[in-house]
């Protein structure tokens, strides 16, 4: 595993996102959980984002820590997420995790699909 780093120029994990993840982990009652963010093929624009909780840290994962929360990214997904911002927003249309990705050449209206 690559060391946990606080490097905003590589990836921004906002306070809002970290605090919401902490709240969700507390609700699960398992402090070993970490948030895994990944990119997979699919969606209407070619790639889509995914979020899951994971207790396992793979040797080649990159880990980011913020407010006591660990964010994990696998090497394939990492290349698509460099420079991205992971945020949590609440508004009239509901609440959701949002990825603002400067590497995306286009995005879908659903907000979870992009092309690079």
Curated annotation (Swiss-Prot):
Assembly and binders: Homodimer.
Metal-binding as UniProt keyword: yes
Taxonomic superkingdom: Bacteria
Family: Belongs to the HesB/IscA family.
Names of the cofactor(s): iron-sulfur cluster
Sequence positions that bind iron-sulfur cluster: 44, 108, 110
Keywords, ordered alphabetically: Iron, Iron-sulfur, Metal-binding
Name under which the protein is recorded: Putative iron-sulfur cluster insertion protein ErpA
Signal sequence interval, chain numbering: none
Gene Ontology process terms (BP): iron-sulfur cluster assembly
SUPFAM superfamilies the record matches: HesB-like domain
Species the sequence originates in: Azoarcus sp. (strain BH72)
Gene Ontology MF term list: 2 iron, 2 sulfur cluster binding; 4 iron, 4 sulfur cluster binding; iron ion binding
UniProt-listed NCBIfam families: iron-sulfur cluster assembly accessory protein, PRK13623.1
Note accompanying the cofactor annotation: Binds 1 iron-sulfur cluster per subunit.
Biological function: Required for insertion of 4Fe-4S clusters.
Pfam families the record matches: Fe-S_biosyn
């Amino acid at each position: 595993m690559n060391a946990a780093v606080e490097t905003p120029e590589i990836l921004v994990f906002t306070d809002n996102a970290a605090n919401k993840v902490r709240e969700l982990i507390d609700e699960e009652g398992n402090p070993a959980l970490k948030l895994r963010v990944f990119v997979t093929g699919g969606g209407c624009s070619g790639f889509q984002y995914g979020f899951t909780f994971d207790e396992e840290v793979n040797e080649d994962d990159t880990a980011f820590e913020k407010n006591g929360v660990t964010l994990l990214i696998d090497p394939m997904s990492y290349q698509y997420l460099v420079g991205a911002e992971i945020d949590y927003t609440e508004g009239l249309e509901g609440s959701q995790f949002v990825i603002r990705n400067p590497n995306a050449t286009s995005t879908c209206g659903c907000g979870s699909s992009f092309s690079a």
